[in-house]
């Protein structure tokens, strides 16, 4: 008889849907340990604008994979999968259940399905690409990527040389586009996963929550946090960190491209668009149990029952 795989829980949902509150409540009942699945919460010094769990929340339920990088650094889905698997295994060794909480669907997908191994970096080809960029400009190289891999070109900004260079490098090494390779599934997740998504039933309620949260972030000092980042000479608006929702709009304000009120409005609109994309992902997700943001008690009971029934089946 083969040994049963360990249990892991996914708690997904759009931004401002109440994931953190629900996860903390669950940890107070069961031996779960939280792992953040959020491409913005990884950055140090970006606390208010990302709605990062505060000190009290972190004391109640410490989150792994928060504050692990400086905003100058990039982080891929492959990096996340590596770090999340390591954290999940540590939690299981402690006799507890990994609870993965967040809204970065690409990270959840990479963790669940695995990633096709990409070719290793080739210094000679990378140098060749950098030389071409010096003579032609990155915009010309972006046009080249658009021809061979329009999907990646749509995701990668012309002023993001690190990711643009890597996409071209992968194609020149392997003869396959980054999109082709990343769509190929890799090693599956060695866990029994129960998957949940939380969201309000009505879109208007989610919009209300998003606007309220943005207002609270401004009251908490988001502008001051943004100014501290803006004064750093090593940060610019084409970095993945500064492209995070809210931060890009506030950067435009500090650059003098719009008023503060306009930046807030654009930030709220961008957050709504993000939430719409997250819900679109989730609607096509298999084996998903939906929870209601407006009924946290019932959502907590549903999660609790899932853990209890799993324990009973293992006896």
Curated annotation (Swiss-Prot):
Sorted UniProt keywords:
ATP-binding, Magnesium, Nucleotide-binding, Transferase, tRNA processing
Name any one GO molecular function: ATP binding
Task: List site positions: Interaction with substrate tRNA.
Answer: 104, 126
EC nos: 2.5.1.75
Q: Which co-factors does it depend on?
A: Mg(2+)
Superkingdom of origin organism: Bacteria
- Point out the signal peptide segment: none
Annotated ATP binding lies at: 13-20
Q: Enumerate the residues binding substrate.
A: 15-20
Segments traversing the membrane: none
Any GO BP:
tRNA modification
InterPro entries listed in its UniProt record: Dimethylallyltransferase, IPT, P-loop_NTPase
Sequence segments annotated as region (Interaction with substrate tRNA): 38-41, 162-166, 243-248, 276-283
The record lists the catalysed reaction(s) as: adenosine(37) in tRNA + dimethylallyl diphosphate = N(6)-dimethylallyladenosine(37) in tRNA + diphosphate
Q: How does it assemble?
A: Monomer.
Q: Which PANTHER family match?
A: TRNA DIMETHYLALLYLTRANSFERASE (PTHR11088:SF60)
Give the family per the record.
Answer: Belongs to the IPP transferase family.
Q: What does this protein do?
A: Catalyzes the transfer of a dimethylallyl group onto the adenine at position 37 in tRNAs that read codons beginning with uridine, leading to the formation of N6-(dimethylallyl)adenosine (i(6)A).
Tell me what this protein is called.
Answer: tRNA dimethylallyltransferase
What is the species listed in this Swiss-Prot or TrEMBL entry? Vibrio vulnificus (strain YJ016)
């Amino acid at each position: 008889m083969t040994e049963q795989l360990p249990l892991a829980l996914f708690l997904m949902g759009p931004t401002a849907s109440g994931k953190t509150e629900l996860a903390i409540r669950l940890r107070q009942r069961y031996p779960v340990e939280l792992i953040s699945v959020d491409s913005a919460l990884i950055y140090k010094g970006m606390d208010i604008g990302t709605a990062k769990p505060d000190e009290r929340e972190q004391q109640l339920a410490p989150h792994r994979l928060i504050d692990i990088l400086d905003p100058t650094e990039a982080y891929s889905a492959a990096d996340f999968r590596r770090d999340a698997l390591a954290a999940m295994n540590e939690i299981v060794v402690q006799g507890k259940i990994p609870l993965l909480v967040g809204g970065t669907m690409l990270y959840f997908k990479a963790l669940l399905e695995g990633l096709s191994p990409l070719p290793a970096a080739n210094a000679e080809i990378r140098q060749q690409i950098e030389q071409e960029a010096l003579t032609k400009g990155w915009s010309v190289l972006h046009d080249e990527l658009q021809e061979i891999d329009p999907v990646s070109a749509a995701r990668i900004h012309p002023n993001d040389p690190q990711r643009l260079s890597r996409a071209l490098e992968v194609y020149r090494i392997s003869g396959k586009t980054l999109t082709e390779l990343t769509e190929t599934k890799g090693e599956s997740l060695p866990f029994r996963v129960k998957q949940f998504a939380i969201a309000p039933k009505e879109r208007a309620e989610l919009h209300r929550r998003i606007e309220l949260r943005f207002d609270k972030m401004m009251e908490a000092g988001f502008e001051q946090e943004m100014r501290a980042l803006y004064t750093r000479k090593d940060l610019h608006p084409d970095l993945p960190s500064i492209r995070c929702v809210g931060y890009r709009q506030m950067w435009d304000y500090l650059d003098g491209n719009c008023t503060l009120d306009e930046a807030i409005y654009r930030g709220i609109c961008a957050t709504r668009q993000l939430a719409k994309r997250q819900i679109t992902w989730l609607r096509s997700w298999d084996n998903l149990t939906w929870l209601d943001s407006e009924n946290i008690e019932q959502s907590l009971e549903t999660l609790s029952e899932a853990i209890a029934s799993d324990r009973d089946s293992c006896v």
